[in-house]
Every structure is written in structure tokens, then in C-alpha cells.
A protein has these predicted regions:
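All-alpha RGS (Regulator of G-protein Signaling) helical domain and cognate RGS-like helical scaffolds
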Residues: 2-11, 20-24, 29-263
Length: 263
């Protein structure tokens, strides 16, 4: 996954077609909960397109964090660093279920592909993880711009804040990687392709939009991870697919749970 894939109109149309997102704009409107219909105009096909793209991203995030917890280097992390990863897994699953409750649809993509040394190399894993979080942050900011419903805009901002936490915490974990696992890792390369020092781990004054203004740009960035043909073109290991397995999440603190779309 890199920024070179972003903006391909043909790839975006192919991806949307295979995901069935265009049909979802009409097919799911009748099944949406009351909150999605609160405004006179209701939820729009554009809203559904963003939400289904977000579901794909969250399914990918859950799959990524799940397999990080199974990686050999994970066992050698400090307990608090392990806790960051485990909590992020729960949070991403909660995001997925919330979005699914609005669309009435499951993610159309549930199998994902990574570089060959993903989960065996801590450096590769953290670079990919931060790249994904970069993409998720920018994608939710598109939702903030483009959702037709105020409650959905605010919810996108609330989720984006958590994705920002995850990006920072991945950078916190990097120096704690054990020497036997290639640590300490002092630089992380995210989606912009620039190696950035992990000191400080919270190195953004403002979240990065990546210049994205349309959800198709986020979809194009995720294409090599979610689509086998695109993964092969990107040089990813398609012989070892990873499957999304939903579960019932337990969030770390009741005060931080989703109580309503109103906040």
C-alpha cells in the first residue's frame, strides 16, 4: 500500500463494483436505524459509500491487530505496550459494529493481504500499521467533510480521534521492540513514505488529510490490501491470506463507550 495507488479512477470503480457499494446506496435505506433518518433528507447513497468503505477499513484494522497479538515479537513487548495493541483491537471492532448497524451490511471484503514479512518483522508491521492508521484518519476526515448528517459527521470525528491515538501508540511501541526482534525501532515510515523519528511519538500538530477529498482516494489506498489482484501487483504475499473474524468487543472504559450519536 502506498500513495502511488491513490486516485486511480478505474481501480476505484472496479473495487466499488465488486463491493456492491453502488447498490448498497439504495438497498439498505429501508433498514437503517432511526438515527440515520433523523434529518428530513435521511441518509444518502454517498453516506453509505463512505460507511461501507469505513467498514472495510475497520475489518482490515481488526484483522491487523489480531495478528499482531499473535506475532512472535508481540510477546517480547512490555505489558503496557501489549495493552495498547489489545485495546486498539477492541476499539476497531466496536467501530466496525457501529458502522454495520447503520448500513445494515457486513463488510464486502473480509480477506486481506500484506507484505511477505508482515507479522514476522516488527519494523514492517509497525510501518504498515502506521500507514493504515494514516489512511484511516484521512478517510474519516473525508466523512467529516462529506457526510450529509450532522450526527454522522460528529461520529466520524469521534472515531478519527481514536485512530489518531492508535497511530501515536504504534509509534510509542516502536522503541520498545526487543533487540532480538530488530529493536529498538527509532523511525517509522507511514503512508507518505517518509521515515519519521518516533521521538516524540505524537508528532502531529494537526491531523494529516493526505490531500484527500473523496472517499475513492481512501478506497484506492486500501485496494492492495483488500483485493488479491491488486495485492499481487503491489508485491504482497497472496499465498497467505488473513481473514476477518468478528467478535463482541469489550472496551477499556465505560466512559469511552458509544452511548449515542448525540455524544
Amino acid at each position: 500500500m502506498n500513495r502511488e495507488t491513490v486516485g486511480s479512477g478505474t481501480d476505484r470503480r472496479t473495487f466499488l463494483g465488486r463491493a456492491g457499494i453502488a447498490a448498497a446506496g439504495v438497498a439498505t435505506l429501508g433498514a437503517l436505524p432511526a438515527i440515520a433518518k433523523a434529518d428530513a433528507g435521511g441518509i444518502t447513497p454517498g453516506d453509505v459509500e463512505i460507511l461501507v468503505a469505513a467498514e472495510i477499513a475497520e475489518a482490515l484494522a481488526v484483522t491487523t491487530y489480531t495478528n499482531i497479538t499473535r506475532a512472535a515479537f508481540f510477546a517480547n513487548l512490555a505489558s503496557d505496550d501489549q495493552g495498547y495493541i489489545e485495546a486498539a483491537r477492541q476499539e476497531e471492532m466496536s467501530h466496525y459494529l457501529l458502522e454495520q448497524s447503520v448500513t445494515g451490511k457486513s463488510s464486502p471484503f473480509t480477506t486481506f493481504y500484506y507484505p511477505a514479512d508482515m507479522f514476522s518483522s516488527a519494523r514492517t508491521t509497525l510501518n504498515v500499521l502506521v500507514s493504515l492508521e494514516d489512511a484511516f484518519i484521512a478517510a474519516y476526515l473525508i466523512g467529516v467533510r462529506q457526510f450529509s448528517h450532522d450526527d454522522l459527521r460528529v461520529t466520524a470525528a469521534r472515531i478519527m480521534g481514536i485512530e489518531s491515538d492508535h497511530r501515536t501508540l504504534a509509534r510509542v511501541v516502536a522503541p520498545g521492540v526487543a533487540a532480538q526482534d530488530g529493536g529498538p525501532i527509532e523511525e517509522i515510515t507511514g503512508l507518505q513514505g517518509v521515515a519519521e523519528s518516533v521521538d516524540p511519538p505524537n508528532n502531529n500538530g494537526y491531523e494529516r488529510t493526505l490531500g484527500w477529498t473523496k472517499i475513492g482516494q481512501a478506497i484506492a489506498a486500501l485496494l492492495p490490501v483488500a483485493d488479491k489482484d491488486a495485492a499481487e501487483k503491489a508485491g504482497f504475499d497472496t499465498s497467505k491470506p488473513y481473514t476477518f473474524h468478528p467478535f463482541t468487543p469489550v472496551l477499556p472504559n465505560p466512559l469511552g463507550e458509544f452511548h449515542s450519536f448525540k455524544g
